[in-house]
From Swiss-Prot:
Keywords: Ribonucleoprotein, Ribosomal protein, RNA-binding, rRNA-binding. PANTHER family: 50S RIBOSOMAL PROTEIN L21 (PTHR21349), LARGE RIBOSOMAL SUBUNIT PROTEIN BL21M (PTHR21349:SF0). GO terms for biological process: translation. Belongs to the bacterial ribosomal protein bL21 family. The lineage of its organism: Bacteria, Pseudomonadati, Pseudomonadota, Alphaproteobacteria, Caulobacterales. This protein binds to 23S rRNA in the presence of protein L20. Pfam families: Ribosomal_L21p. Residues 154-163 have a biased composition (Basic residues). This is Large ribosomal subunit protein bL21. The keyword Ribosomal protein applies.
């Protein structure tokens, strides 16, 4: 069973067990997410199209993480003027595991398990370092370096002598 849902201004075709990357959703990792705006349901040849949505249809999922997406580069240029500007932008996105598609008296569930292990630990395991290589907490801030010994004060230049006054009329 599959469904076409609308979220974040875009439409997605999903079925139970799919991993879905959508615009940013509010919530912590592991939170349940429900998409109520189901535009179409289908199973084999049987298709139910909503007008505009299918009544009573719900797609449920679990929020796995919220992250930044790929960088989009913005480049502006005015030729022959020496004007060039480069900027970048990374949009927030959420990763959702679809756990069930329900509607029209039917329901399709995903029977797998959801792993919320942080990416740092997964990377350490992939490199063969194991979980022991990953610190359990964020390390404490590094202490400030000891102050340097003060250097000897610089000698001041001797004041300039005033020019000798001459009296007029002396010869």
């Amino acid at each position: 069973m599959y469904a076409v849902i609308k979220t974040g201004g875009k439409q997605y075709r999903v079925q139970a067990g799919d991993l879905l990357v959508v615009e940013k959703l509010e919530g912590e990792p592991g939170a349940a997410v429900a998409f109520g705006e189901v535009l179409m349901l289908g199973e084999g040849e049987a298709v139910t199209v909503g007008a505009p949505t299918v009544d009573g249809a719900v797609v449920s999922g679990t929020l796995l993480e919220t992250r930044k997406g790929e960088k989009v580069k913005i480049f502006k240029k005015i030729r022959r003027q020496g004007y060039r500007r480069t900027r970048g932008h990374r949009q927030f996105e959420s990763v959702v595991r679809v756990t069930s598609v329900a509607g029209a008296g039917k329901e399709a569930k995903w029977e797998g398990t959801i792993d919320l292990t942080p990416k740092v630990i997964l990377d350490a395991r992939a490199r063969g370092l194991g979980d022991a290589a990953v610190p359990a907490t964020i390390p404490a801030p590094v202490e400030a370096a000891p102050a340097k010994a003060e250097a000897a004060p610089k000698k001041k230049a001797a004041p300039k002598k005033a020019a000798a006054k001459t009296e007029e009329g002396e010869a």
